[in-house]
Amino acid sequence: MERSPQLARLVAWLEEMHARVMQAEQAALAVMGDMPAYTARMQEKARLLASLEEEGEAYLEELPEQLQDQAGHRLHRFSASARNALRIGSIFYMSALLYPEDHKPGQPDDLQVFIRRLRDEGEHYTLHPQD
C-alpha cells in the first residue's frame, strides 16, 4: 500500500524507537546476573516507551485527523503502560512491556505489530478491539 510521506516519517521514527527499545532490552539480558545494571537497562526500556506519546505528537500532527486519533491512541497506550511500570518500579512489568500474555519467542511484539499494520494499512489504519 502506498504511504504518504508523513506516514512514512511516522513509521521510520517508530522503527528507530523500536530498535532503541530492543537495544535496551538486549543490554538488560546481557547483564541479567547484575541486578542494578539489569534494573537500569529495563528502566531505560520503559523510559523510551514512555516517551512515545509525547515525541510522537510531531509526527501525528502531519497526518489526517482520523489517523492522528487512531495512531495517537496506540502511542498513548504504549506510553501509559511504561509510565505505570516506572511509577510502581516493577522490573517484571518493565520486562513484559510490549509482550502480550500469550507471546511466544519469535513472534512480533506489540510495537512491531503496530508498525506493520501502519505500513500495510496506511491511511486506512484503524484500531482493533485488542488495541
List where the protein language model places each region.
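Amphipathic alpha-helical binding modules
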Residues: 77-131
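Generic structural concept
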Residues: 11-14, 18, 46, 50-53, ...
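Helix-centric, low-specificity signal for extended rod-like, repetitive segments
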Residues: 2, 6, 13, 38, ...
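Short, solvent-exposed, charged loop/turn and helix-capping segments
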Residues: 49-79
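Coiled-coil heptad-register positions
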Residues: 25, 32, 39, 60, ...
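Short amphipathic alpha-helical segments that mediate assembly, nucleic-acid/protein binding
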Residues: 3, 7, 45, 53-56, ...
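Short terminal alpha-helical segments
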Residues: 1-43
